[in-house]
UniProtKB/Swiss-Prot annotation:
One of its GO terms (molecular function) is tryptophan synthase activity. It comes from Buchnera aphidicola subsp. Rhopalosiphum maidis. The gene is trpB. Pathway: Amino-acid biosynthesis; L-tryptophan biosynthesis; L-tryptophan from chorismate: step 5/5. It catalyses: (1S,2R)-1-C-(indol-3-yl)glycerol 3-phosphate + L-serine = D-glyceraldehyde 3-phosphate + L-tryptophan + H2O. The beta subunit is responsible for the synthesis of L-tryptophan from indole and L-serine. The keyword Amino-acid biosynthesis applies. This is Tryptophan synthase beta chain. It comes from the Bacteria. The lineage of its organism: Bacteria, Pseudomonadati, Pseudomonadota, Gammaproteobacteria, Enterobacterales.
Length: 225
């Protein structure tokens, strides 16, 4: 949506690649993008989700790099994309830190954020990395880790190369990327941004996972507060 708004503002052509499953799951956002004049391309390759859309977008860009620019919304992929995304997303952390200091006069004990590719999480973590604040990332356990239908590569994946980056991946014994699963389209990704893998490796951040059912229950509890 942000890309389509920017393109509309500067009168640029905008092509958005989305997995066909995500188009169904995010129909309100698709409507907004089309309203701004974006061309939304349905990707039916592979699992028809985020990773396949990313692959198609990169394929398009590599064949048209002289007249187009590639943009990704998650903090993953080859350098400098994770850094670019983090720099924009860290506004989340800056605003959160400012507001909690204004209201509580102290820093929080912990920061908790969902982690798919990890852009929102790295955005809020960035402002608290050098503070005495626990950082907790929550990966999607989907239908249950034991079922294999999840998106939790940090605790249940292996290190590898994917999408132009070295990070934690969901892959089989032959090194092939496995399908991820999450009720949330934004978390349905078989890898994670490399900075999260680094934070995990040095124990600066803790990463846990919850199932789709647990996430929905938490959403309902929060909505009633």
């Amino acid at each position: 949506v942000a890309v389509s708004i920017a393109c509309a503002l500067f009168n640029l052509k905008c092509k958005i690649y989305m997995g066909y499953k995500d188009i169904k799951r995010q129909s309100p956002n698709v409507f907004r993008m089309k309203l701004m004049g974006a061309e939304v391309i349905s990707v039916r390759n592979g699992s028809g989700t985020l990773k396949d859309a990313c692959n198609e977008a990169l394929r398009d860009w590599s064949g048209n790099y002289q007249k187009s620019h590639y943009i990704i919304g998650t903090a993953a992929g080859p350098h400098p994309y994770p850094t670019i995304v983090k720099e924009f997303q860290k506004m989340i952390g800056e605003e959160a830190k400012k507001q909690i200091l204004e209201q509580e006069k102290k820093l929080p004990d912990a920061i908790i954020a969902c982690v798919g590719g990890g852009s929102n999480a790295i955005g809020i973590f960035s402002e608290f990395m050098n503070e005495k604040v626990d950082l907790i990332g929550v990966e999607p356990a989907g239908r249950g880790i034991e079922t294999g239908k999840h998106g939790a590569p940090l605790n249940h994946g292996r290190t590898g190369i994917y999408f132009g980056m070295k990070s934690s991946l969901m892959q089989n014994q032959e090194g092939q990327i496995e399908k991820s699963w999450s009720i949330s389209a934004g978390l349905d990704f078989p890898s994670v941004g490399p900075e999260h893998a680094w934070l995990h490796s040095i124990n600066r951040a803790q990463y846990v996972s919850i199932t789709d059912i647990e996430a929905l229950e938490a959403f309902q509890i929060l909505s009633k507060k």
